[in-house]
Amino acid sequence: MKFEVISQIENIEVISVGTDIRNLAYLEKAYGSGRWRKLKGVAHVRLPNGNIRWVELHWYEAHGIGRKNIKIKRYVE
């Protein structure tokens, strides 16, 4: 699903780091090696139909590579 993050991501928590990540081999092959972390947080997003919703997001991040594979996991509001 396409969406646009329109606010700062808040309440960021680390879910897992390094070899604890199931998709680590994919991340390193697609984006390069690094200290990969899986994180979650909440933010306002604009959905394709124009609605703005408060959602929980999950994504992967590595220093020097940035945020990758941002996904909506659930609607908070």
Which functions belong to the PLM regions below?
Residues M1-E77:
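Cysteine-centric segments in proteins
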